[in-house]
C-alpha cells in the first residue's frame, strides 16, 4: 500500500544532511506549524462549500454558482470579506477575556487536529495516551465559549454560553465512554497502534454489536459537541440572536466559525481512526483479488473518503432534523445515551472475553 511516510522521512534526512540537530528540530517545527495552518484553512473552506452544496441539495436548490466554476471560490470570497470587516469595540466588556476566548477556541481545535493520524507517519504527535489526549484537549474549547459569553456582558451571550457548557460537558461523557469500548477492544490508547491493529478488520466489524452501538453513540454525542443542528441551542437565532458570539465581528467571529467547521471534521476523523480503520483499506476475508485492488488505493485517500462520509451524515442530520428543546437535549444524554454507553462497556467486556 502507498503511504506518505516516505515524504516525512526524506525531509528529515535532507535536513539532517545540511543542518545540526538543533536547527533541524526548529525547521521541522516551523514546517509542521505552517502545514497545519494551511491544511486547517483549506479544510475549513472546503467544508463550508460542501455544507452549502449539501444544504442546497436537500432544499432542491443549486447552492453557490457565481464565484468561480460551480461556485468553488465562494468560500474564498467570504473569507476575504470577513477578514476586511471592522472589529467593533463593545462598551463594558472584559477586554482581556473577550479577546482571549477566541484564541482558546481556535488553539484547542488546532491541538486536537495535530494529533490525528492521517496516514502512516503523517501526524504531528503520537502519544501513547492518544485517546485521552484527544478527549482532554478537545474539551478545552468549552472554556473559550464560556469566557466569550461572560466577557461580552450580554444576556444573550451568557445564556448561550451556559447552554453550550451544559451541552458539551454532558455529551463529553458519552463520547468518552464510547471511545473506551475501542480502547478495550484494541488494548491500546495510542492512535497509530489502534489503526495498525485494524489491518485484519475494522473495529466496527471486529467489535460486533457493542462496537456498532458505540459508533452510533459517538456520532450522536460528537455531533452534539459541535453545537450544530439539531443540537444548536447555544446559537438559536430565534431566541439568542447569535448565541455566545453575538458581540464578535470580523476575524474574531471568523475564528469561532472556523473552529466549528474544523471540530466537525475532527469528530469525523476520530470516528474514522478508531472505528473505521483509519487509513486501512476495506478487506473482505476470502476475496483476495478484491483486497489486492483495494491495496492499490493510497491510504490517505481511504482516510479522507471515510471521514467525508461521516461528515456527510452529520450534514444530513443537520439539514433534516428540527432543533431540540433544552430538556429534550439533556434527556437524550442523561436518560438514553449515558445508560446505554455504560451497559455497552459491559457488553464489550463480555464480547472480548467470550467471543
From Swiss-Prot:
Record GO biological process: aerobic respiration
GO molecular function, one term: quinone binding
InterPro entries assigned: NADH_UbQ_OxRdtase_su1/FPO (IPR001694), NADH_UbQ_OxRdtase_su1_CS (IPR018086)
Membrane-crossing segments per the record: 29-49, 96-116, 129-149, 175-195, 204-224, 264-284, 296-316, 335-355
Enzyme class per UniProt: translocase
Keyword terms: Cell inner membrane, Cell membrane, Membrane, NAD, Quinone, Translocase, Transmembrane, Transmembrane helix, Ubiquinone
HAMAP family, alphabetized: NDH1_NuoH (MF_01350)
Job of this protein: NDH-1 shuttles electrons from NADH, via FMN and iron-sulfur (Fe-S) centers, to quinones in the respiratory chain. The immediate electron acceptor for the enzyme in this species is believed to be ubiquinone. Couples the redox reaction to proton translocation (for every two electrons transferred, four hydrogen ions are translocated across the cytoplasmic membrane), and thus conserves the redox energy in a proton gradient. This subunit may bind ubiquinone.
Protein name, as recorded: NADH-quinone oxidoreductase subunit H
Source organism of this protein record: Azobacteroides pseudotrichonymphae genomovar. CFP2
